[in-house]
Amino acid sequence: MLVSYNWLKQYTNIEDNATDLAEKVTRGGIEVEGVEYLADNISNVVVGYVETKEKHPDAEKLNVCTVNVGEEDKLQIVCGAPNVDAGQYVIVAKVGATLPGIKIKKAKLRGVESQGMICSLKELGLNQSVVPKKYQDGIYVFESEQKLGADAVEVLGLNDYILDLSITPNRADALSMRGLAYELGALYNQKVTFADSEVEENYSDTELKVVVESDSCKNYLGQVVKNIEVKDSPLWLQTRLMNSGIRPINNIVDITNFVLLEFGQPMHAFDKDLVGNSIVVRNAKEGEVLETLDGEERKLQESDLVITDGTKPIALGGVMGGKNTEVSNNTKNIILESAYFNPVSIRRTSAAHGLRSDSSARFEKGIDPNMQKAAIQRAVELILELCPNATVEASVGVVNKEEEKEVVISTSYINNYLGITLSTEEITSILESLSFSVEVNGEELTVKIPTRRPDISIKQDLVEEVIRIYGYDNLASTLPKFSKTTKGGLTYSQRAIRDLRKVYVGLGFNDTINYSLVSDEESTQYTLDNHHKVRLMMPMTETHSTLRQSLIPGLLNTVQYNVARKQKDLKLLEIGRVFFGSGDDNIQPKETLYLSGALTGEENSTKWLNESSVIDFYTAKGYLEVIFERLGLDEKVSYKKEKIDGMHPGRTAEVYLGEKLIGFIGEIHPVVASDKDLNETYVFEINLDEVISESKVKPRYEEVTKYPEITRDIAMLVDLVDEYQNIYDVIESINSKLITKIELFDLYVGPELLVGKKSIALTITYSDKQKTLTDEEVTKVHEKVLKALDEYGAIIR
């Protein structure tokens, strides 16, 4: 937002220069992105009067003008502007003058001497977007008589500094001069007062009828002004608008824009003779079309709020007026509109039509719902000032006054929050400087919040206001106060996580961090249980709309990204949190720490000394078991073949810690891999919180046995569908302390075997830490193993 320094000074007694003011405003919480002096690099530019204009004798498009600049000698100036003419008051840059990027010298143009230049506004540095259309292709002409030789910089209001403010969405009140005046009053500890409208309220009755049929319109005022004269605005009004980044159009439109800047209240003027006596505010109907003021024909949607004459749309409410009721030079009677529209409705309409305006920008952020009457009175006052013969009818419409919110807070609450000591009187003074009403009862303050400040609703908001005005720089730098200190250190869980990261990085894994937000579809992929989703209310994109319930989708996307860039051998690890909703919006989602891995390609693929090996299920399983070995849980872990959505139906297993399901491991389903252009890819995922909580035991060290081990091999036939885990569990069920190791060393499937059978061979290791085992002792236990396997259904070979 562009703000005039000179305009601001009309509301407050500011002595600071523009740069110091900008610094103070920024420290108060409203960022000033820049300060520009409009007359920078402009000198020796004055007001002149064109006394004569003659055609250049040797150039068809040039004119030779005699210009009076209030000096004894008249200036001869050659000018090529198509709109220059005798009898005009113009801007003259004399010889020796400087303009942005130009220094004026005496010159000859096609043989005729020129003693200066008649200037356009663009040549003075004004942006073409704010120059009145009638002067865009030529020089600027003053509409009224001016003092000859007067400094054109002062006459045009260019002796002004423009502050470029970056207004955050919560501070819509600062999108107006009055709102900024309140802010400056608080920052400089000055009382801000505004002159009431001088317009008498004894207007004649009106025939205008206003009907509001949409909930998106809370307040709507219409007021008829007759017998106006549409013409160019006076210079003071034009310069106010141009300095604020708005192009002057005509006096009526300029007044509505001026009130927009002054009050922050968007307004609109309709040609009453094109509207009639009826205004109906409603939602658009299917098939309705409106040509807006920018000349675009827009097909309306049922969600659009429109202003109608009772039959057809005449404006897109809060966004832009319609071409069919535009104020023109022939307009004699107008209807002024001052309304409060729902911010969400305006934002939706603006986005749907790709149409933004100064009005919609303010409605979207939220304006003061009690400002409509004051704004329309100010507009009427200005119209009567510029059109003395105009007559005004009484305003009519729907007004729902909004009550001021109250927030109760205490002095101690503010001081405790900020870590400072302010008295109740000091806090009250700060809040009252913001034009808040404060009722004091001991140290308790009941603060009434003006309706222009919708951003303030809770105690913390008031704390922020106090420290903004008190000054962040006034906070003393102090060390925290501690009654006692405790030695810092990592928790068991933190140490375990750090240790696992180091181990996996040492094994060649890349530690990965992915977004916690995924698409709605991805949020429930690769989950073992059904949980409620945790969705954002207003996601930036649909691909990042829901909190993840598994780390696998993010890892697979990372694998896909890298494989597409020719990184085919990957081992990725991620330790991160997943989120499970409860189905109750009032209950926080449960956060659980997971560990996941993804592997694809080969190992040792670039090592000349070792043969490469393709990553398979057992490669992934070996890496997963590193976790359990590090945490001393390897004997408690078991695997169960299972089908999981998105995983290969024959190469996937659930992982159990005791009787508790903690995760899974397996190959990504070939269809999923094909969709992502991946080769065989294996993943594993476990609930790390569960694993760490089970491992919270101190490590126990045992002496390596001094006695020899005895091994016995067993070969057997089992069903093809039998899992090795089942065989392992049968042997473990013997529950003999002498069995210290069970290893699978051979697996065979072939036509020589019985139909539906496979051959497996195991080595069982027996040992005793206290003595050397005898053959009889080993045989006794081994026979129990054979019997258990026989009962299971295995055929011992």
What spans do the regions from the language model cover?
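Mobile "lid/hinge" segments at catalytic clefts and subdomain interfaces of large enzymes
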Residues: 113-127, 134, 307-406, 562, ...
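Phosphate-backbone binding interfaces of nucleic-acid-interacting proteins
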Residues: 1-198, 335, 354, 358, ...
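Conserved mixed alpha/beta core segments that line enzyme active sites in large multi-domain catalysts
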Residues: 47-77, 250, 256-324
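Glycine/proline-enriched, intrinsically flexible loops and inter-domain linkers
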Residues: 4-5, 63, 188, 193-288, ...
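Extended, well-folded interaction surfaces typified by the phenylalanyl-tRNA synthetase beta subunit core
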Residues: 407-411, 415-570, 712-715, 765-767, ...
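A carboxyl-terminal module marker
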Residues: 2, 433-436, 514, 585, ...
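Short, hydrophobic beta-strand segments
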Residues: 3-8, 159-168, 218-226, 358-365, ...
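Terminal amphipathic helices with adjacent charged low-complexity linkers/tails
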Residues: 188-211, 387-413
